[in-house]
Amino acid sequence: MNELIFMVEEAPEGGFVARALGESIFTEADTIAELSGKVRDAVRCHFEEGKAPKIVRLHHVREEVITV
């Protein structure tokens, strides 16, 4: 695996959550900057030495409701 994508969303209670697509990896943090470090740690813990993807992408999803 060369690349892993995380979907990042704002948590209802505040902060952010990140879920890996195709892997059972989940983490959360209060800030985006903190989340990046936690994603790195979670990926390192999930994969065996030398098996982790080379690239991790954080795909930020933000839902906004507007009236028309």
Regions inferred by a protein language model and the residue ranges of each:
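Short aromatic-glycine-(Arg/Gly/Cys) micro-motifs in beta-strand/loop hairpins
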Residues: 8-20
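Short acidic, gly/pro-rich beta-turn/loop elements at beta-sheet edges
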Residues: 16, 28, 37
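Short aromatic/hydrophobic contact patches that present stacked aromatics
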Residues: 5, 17, 26
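A short, exposed loop/beta-hairpin motif centered on an aromatic-Gly-Thr core
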Residues: 23-33
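Short, charged, surface-exposed hinge/linker loops at domain edges
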Residues: 1-5, 33, 37-68
